[in-house]
Amino acid sequence: MAQKKGGGSTRNGRDSESKRLGVKVFGGQAINAGGIIIRQRGTRVHAGDNVGVGKDHTLFALVDGHVQFAVKGPAKKQHVSVVPAA
């Protein structure tokens, strides 16, 4: 008979890779057309002027300019816009 239990596999050791979500360019910072502003799950922040929405809800700039955040509407939803460079 074995004097020790078999060294079975542990039940730990699994974790998903982080998805690197969040704001990539903050208010007042310059951004080029096509640059990613926010990576998010769902529309936590909504697209404003000159901002496009990707199929994974990523917000990106449609023109060169500066990023501007605002809270709009009675529901106080956060919106992000790009103010074109003058």
Curated annotation (Swiss-Prot):
UniProt keyword list: Ribonucleoprotein, Ribosomal protein
Organism: Cupriavidus pinatubonensis (strain JMP 134 / LMG 1197)
GO molecular function: structural constituent of ribosome
Protein name: Large ribosomal subunit protein bL27
Alphabetized Gene3D superfamilies for the sequence: 2.40.50.100
Family that this chain belongs to: Belongs to the bacterial ribosomal protein bL27 family.
Residue segments, region Disordered: 1-21
GO CC terms of this entry: cytosolic large ribosomal subunit
GO biological process, one term: translation
Stretches with biased composition (Gly residues): 1-10
